[in-house]
């Protein structure tokens, strides 16, 4: 199995971004959703992205943002990848000069494969826990056995991941990448460097065990 990529989401401070990169994370996530306790403004986001070392991907997370709002942010912040967590249609996610991920919440009864097919231009699909009215960052895991085979796109696994369960999640789901936020925090929006290192080590050790 190829190395699983790791994204540390909900970064709000330069020092947390640098700690994530130093621990071996492949990407960091910046939340542009005002209702989130992990939201960042344009100035802070630009500061964080500019501080990143080479080969660490910067990801912007959006929830039903207008095209005007997206344009303003993308003109100011050199993001590499966009991640859409709301009710966006494919046409809302495209045309921003960046590849994108579409997050789908594992709502009971939903046909995930059919929903994936609605986003043919997506670079990947992120599967997250469904909690009514909450677009992400719930801190709760979902039943990984519900992940369907044959998504046809790189799968990013999110939802309630921690250093204690991520190796099991990787073994069972075999995702392209894992995405964590609350599972590596000291408090909302503030990362715990030791938890970040432990999370990355848990993912990497799983890969070493399989080598």
From Swiss-Prot:
Pfam families: PRAI. Coiled coil: none annotated. It comes from the Bacteria. Pathway: Amino-acid biosynthesis; L-tryptophan biosynthesis; L-tryptophan from chorismate: step 3/5. Gene3D superfamilies: Aldolase class I. The keyword Isomerase applies. This is N-(5'-phosphoribosyl)anthranilate isomerase. Keywords: Amino-acid biosynthesis, Aromatic amino acid biosynthesis, Isomerase, Tryptophan biosynthesis. It catalyses: N-(5-phospho-beta-D-ribosyl)anthranilate = 1-(2-carboxyphenylamino)-1-deoxy-D-ribulose 5-phosphate. Its EC number is 5.3.1.24. Belongs to the TrpF family. The lineage of its organism: Bacteria, Pseudomonadati, Pseudomonadota, Gammaproteobacteria, Pseudomonadales. PANTHER family: N-(5'-PHOSPHORIBOSYL)ANTHRANILATE ISOMERASE. GO terms for molecular function: phosphoribosylanthranilate isomerase activity. InterPro entries: Aldolase_TIM, PRAI_dom, RibuloseP-bd_barrel, TrpF_fam. GO terms for biological process: L-tryptophan biosynthetic process.
């Amino acid at each position: 199995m190829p190395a699983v990529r790791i994204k540390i989401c909900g970064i709000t401070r330069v020092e947390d971004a640098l700690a994530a990169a130093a621990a071996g994370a492949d990407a960091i996530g910046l939340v542009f959703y005002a209702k989130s306790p992990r939201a960042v403004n344009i100035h802070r986001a630009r500061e964080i992205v500019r501080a990143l070392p080479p080969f660490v991907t910067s990801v912007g997370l959006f929830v039903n943002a207008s095209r005007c709002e997206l344009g303003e942010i993308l003109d100011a912040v050199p993001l590499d990848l966009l991640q859409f967590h709301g009710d966006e249609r494919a046409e809302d996610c495209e045309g921003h000069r960046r590849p994108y991920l579409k997050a789908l919440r594992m709502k009971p009864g939903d046909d995930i494969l059919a929903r994936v097919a609605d986003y043919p231009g997506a670079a990947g699909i992120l599967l997250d826990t469904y909690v009514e009215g909450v677009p992400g960052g719930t801190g709760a895991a979902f039943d990984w056995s519900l992940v369907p085979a044959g998504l046809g796109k790189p799968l990013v696994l999110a939802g309630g991941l921690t250093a204690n369960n991520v190796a099991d999640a990787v073994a069972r789901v075999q995702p392209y990448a894992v995405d964590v936020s609350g599972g590596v925090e000291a408090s909302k929006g503030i990362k715990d460097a030791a938890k970040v290192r432990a999370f990355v080590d848990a993912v990497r050790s799983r890969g070493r065990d399989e080598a």
